[in-house]
Amino acid sequence: MDINTKIAEELGIRKEQAAAAVKLIDEGCTIPFIARYRKEATGALSDEILRNLYDRLVYLRNLEDKKQTVLASIEEQGKLTEELRAQILAAETQVAVDDLYRPYRPKRRTRATIAKEKGLEPLANLILLQKMTVSPLEEAKNYINPEKEVSTAEDALNGAKDILAESVSDNADFRTHIRELTMKHGQLLSAAKDPEAESVYEMYYEFSESLSKLAGHRILAISRGEKEKFLIVKIDAPVDRILSYLDRKLITAPSAPTAAVLHEVTEDAYNRLIAPAIEREIRSDLFEKAEDGAIRVFGKNLEQLLMQPPIAGQVVLGWDPAFRTGCKLAVVDPTGKVLDTTVIYPTAPQNRVEEAKAVLKKLISKYHITLISLGNGTASRESEQIIVQLLKEIPEPVQYIIVNEAGASVYSASKLATEEFPQFDVGQRSAASMARRLQDPLAELVKIDPKSIGVGQYQHDMNQKKLTEALDHVVEDCVNRVGVDLNTASASLLEYVSGVSKAIAKNIVVYREENGKFASRSQLLKVAKLGPKAYEQCAGFMRISDGKNPLDATGVHPESYAATKQLLETLGYTLSDVTDRNVAGISKKVRDYKKLAQDLEIGELTLRDIVKELETPARDPREDMPKPILRSDVLEIKDLTPGMVLKGTVRNVIDFGAFVDIGVHQDGLVHISQMCDRFIKHPLEVVSVGDIVEVKVLSVDVKKQRIQLTMKI
C-alpha cells in the first residue's frame, strides 16, 4: 500500500501535498510549524487537515507493521500462498487483517483442535464434499475409536461438526459479510436491570434503535448505564438473514444427506463462535466512533474557550465564593500581578454583609477596580446578590461577570499553583485564577488539565490517553495561533509552543530569571537543551515586544528576516518604520506578489504572510471572537417566563444541543431542533462555546432547575 496515495485519497488532497507533509513530520517538524511556516511545501494545508493526516499516518504505518508480522507468522507455518499474501497486503483495516489471520493464529485447544487430534478431520472434509450416499451418522461409524475417546458414531459426527464450525467461523469473507449484515439490519437493545430503580438512564429502560442510525451520545449514555449496572445491553442481529447466507455459502447440494448436518454446523458456528465476537467488535467500533465524535466536540469547545478574547487594561477583583470558610478575594492588576488578598463572610452561617461591603468598597476605591470576576460554584448566587447591592451603592462604574470555576480547585491545590503563589492559601489562589481567567483566558487555562475544564461530555468514560493527546493538540494549536510573549509567559504556556518540551520550557524561565529579559529571539539558542531544530520550530511563535529587532515582535520567522528587510527596502520602508507602526499600508504597495516573491527568493504564500504580519504586527486573533457579557444586575430562575427574550453565552456544546448561560445560575438548554429552521447534523454547525446568542425562553421548571430555550425568534 502506498501510504501517501491512500492518505491523499482519504483527505481529498494531492499526493504531493501528503508526501511533503509526511516528509516534514518525519524530519521532526510540528503540526503548528508546518501549517504556519511550510505552506509552499504542503500547498497551505490547515492544522486541522495536518492533524488528521498525522493520525492516519500513524494508523496506516501500524497497519503495515501488523501485516508484516502476520505474513511472517503464516510463512513460518509454511501456509502462505500468493493469493493470501495479496489479500493481506490489500487489507485496509486492522480488523480485515485479523480476519485473514484468524485461521493461522496460534490457538488454545478448542473443540475443533481436540476433534482433529482424535482423527476426525477426514470425516469433516467428507461431509463438506457433500457426495455421501449414506447418512453422515452412518459414515461416522467408520471413525469410532475408543482409544481416542470416540466411543460412538454420535461422538465422531459431533467432532466433525466442531471442526467444520470453526472453519466457518475462521472464514474472513463470511465474517466481513456478517458484520455488514448486522450493522445494516441489526438493532441495539437496552433494558433495565431493575425496572423500579430510579436513574438518569430511565429513557433507555426499554430502548431499541437501528445500529446504523445510533447517535454517538446515545451510545455513550447506554455504555455508561451498562457500566453502572442500570442497563442490560445486547445487539439484536438479523439471525435468519445471516443463517440463510451461511447456508447458501456452505450447502452446495441441498438434497444430499449432508444438508441437515451442514445447517446445524452454520447454526453452531454463528451462535457459538461468530455472534459473540461480532457483537463485541461492533459495540467496540460503535463506542470508538462515538468516543472520537465526543472528543472532537470536546476539542472544538475547548478551542473556543481558550480563544476567548482577553479583557485587557482592567484591575480585576477575583471572587471565589463559599459559605462556612468565607469568600476569598484577590485583586489583580492589568498585568496579572496580585495586589491584595482577603477573606469576607457575607454568606451563611456568618452573614456579615455590611462588613463585607465595607471591605469591598475600600478595595474598589484603593485599587480602582473596574471588574469583578465571580466564580460560579457554591454560594455564587448569594455572592452575586451582594455584588448587585454593592454596585447600586457605589459611584464607581464597576461591572461583574460570572466565570466558570471548572478546574480552579484542581489548579489551586496543584504543585504549580503552590510554586506560583507560595504565600497564599488554596482559596486565595483560586480567587487570583478567577481574575486572571478574564484577563487572559489562554494563559490561565493552560495551567489546568484540559479534561478538568468542563466543556465535554462523558470524558471520564473515554480512552484517557487518546483524549489527553487530542486536547493537548487543541491547546498547542491555540497557543501557537496566538503566540507567546517570551519575557512574560509561564512555563505552563511555553511548554505548548511548537518544539518546546516541558524541560525546555522550565529552562527558558530559569534563563530569564538568571539573565533578565530576552533582547532577541536568537538568545533562545543559549537556553539549555534548546538546539537548532527546536529553535527552528519555536522561534516564530515567540514574541519580544521591546527587543532589539522589531521583527521579533511579529510572527515573521527568523529564517525570513533577510527577505523581510529586502522587502521593506524595495517598498521604501526601514525596520524603524516597523517599530513605529508606519507600515500599515504596505499591502497596497505590492503590485505583483508572484514576481516580488521570485525577486526575494521566497514562496508567494510566505510573502503574503510576511506582508500581513507587517501590516498588523502582534495582532491577536482572539480579538475577532465575541466579547463576554458584563452584568450589573441579577436575574433569578423564578423571574423567567415563557416568551422572554434574553442574550446569553454558550457554555457547552454537546451532540444534541447547547447549554446557554443567561445569567440565572442555571444554564438553559437549546435543543438541536431549536437552533435554526434548516436541518443540521450537529450543533457546532450553528454555535460554538463563547458565542453570544439571543434566545427565547420556551419553558421553566423551577423545581427541577431546568430551562428550555430556543434560538428561533
Labelled PLM ranges:
Residues 180-188, 319-323, 377-379, 403-410, ...:
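A glycine-rich phosphate-binding loop feature that marks nucleotide/adenosyl-phosphate handling sites
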Residues 37-39, 128, 238, 321, ...:
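Short, ordered loop/turn segments at secondary-structure junctions
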Residues 30-31, 46-147, 481-624, 631, ...:
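Accessory alpha-helical DNA-binding modules that contact the DNA backbone or grooves
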Residues 141-153, 207, 245-270, 274, ...:
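Low-complexity, acidic/Ser/Thr- and charged residue-rich accessory regions of DNA metabolism proteins
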Residues 49-52, 59, 63-318, 322-423, ...:
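Duplex nucleic acid-engaging cores and interfaces of nucleic-acid transaction enzymes
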Residues 96, 401, 407, 412-482, ...:
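Long, charge-rich intrinsically disordered scaffolds of nucleic-acid metabolism proteins
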Residues 18, 341-348, 371, 413-426, ...:
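Short beta-alpha connecting loops at secondary-structure transitions
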